[in-house]
């Protein structure tokens, strides 16, 4: 239930029902990372609890995004409250940084504070900032964090810098090339594979993906 799938246009009940349908359809929960971050604390907690109860590998969590210019202390308090209310040792959070949409960036300072207080819970980040310098800074500062880029244009770069990979909607239509590069990023033709991937991604970048 991420950005391209318009997850935040769905009600909590719809998101719960969709997740239940996926699990009942024999999609292994260990392969699922539903997005559970909303503007309402109670809704985020409910969605996250449900994902944990279903055995999902983790949750992708936006910060509360309606109010802008919120400082790191306030964002830390929000994430902390969710973690405490969910209250499960099985919870694994992947922070979702997408400032072009949310207008609420997840800073290096906030990441560090969350890792210090919740090292077993906050385990990863999807960086959809669209700014490679930001992604590179996260990789350098927090090498143990499972960091994903939000655009496959950076897939080879992120793998070469120790990142985890990419989480991208367009992987649904460019699956073969992206999987090939992910598996063979050390090969001699890795640059060529990346060029193919980038060319296809740029076609979509020229259009609005959300109607």
Regions inferred by a protein language model and the residue ranges of each:
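Active-site beta->alpha loop and helix N-cap motifs at the rims of alpha/beta catalytic domains
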Residues: 1-105, 122
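NAD(P)-dependent Rossmann-like dehydrogenase/reductase catalytic/cofactor-binding core
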Residues: 210-211
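Catalytic alpha/beta core domains of metabolic enzymes, predominantly
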Residues: 85-91, 99-207
């Amino acid at each position: 239930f991420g950005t391209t799938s318009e997850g935040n246009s769905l009600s909590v009940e719809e998101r719960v029902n969709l997740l239940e349908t996926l699990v009942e359809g024999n999609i292994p929960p260990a392969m699922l990372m539903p997005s559970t971050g909303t503007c309402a604390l109670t809704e985020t907690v409910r969605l996250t609890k449900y994902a944990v109860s279903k055995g999902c590998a983790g949750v992708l969590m936006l910060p509360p995004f309606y109010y802008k210019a919120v400082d790191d202390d306030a964002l830390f308090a929000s994430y902390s409250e969710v973690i405490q209310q969910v209250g499960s040792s099985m919870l694994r959070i992947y922070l979702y940084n997408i400032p072009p949409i949310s207008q609420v960036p997840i800073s290096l300072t906030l990441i560090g504070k969350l890792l210090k207080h919740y090292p077993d819970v906050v385990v990863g980040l999807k960086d959809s900032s669209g700014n490679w310098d930001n992604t590179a800074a996260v990789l350098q500062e927090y090498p143990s964090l499972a960091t994903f880029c939000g655009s496959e244009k950076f897939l080879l770069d992120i793998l070469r810098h120790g990142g985890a990979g990419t989480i991208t909607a367009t992987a649904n239509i460019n699956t073969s090339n992206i999987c090939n590069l992910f598996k063979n990023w050390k090969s001699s033709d890795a640059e060529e594979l990346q060029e193919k991937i980038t060319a296809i991604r740029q076609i979509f970048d020229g259009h609005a993906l959300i109607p």
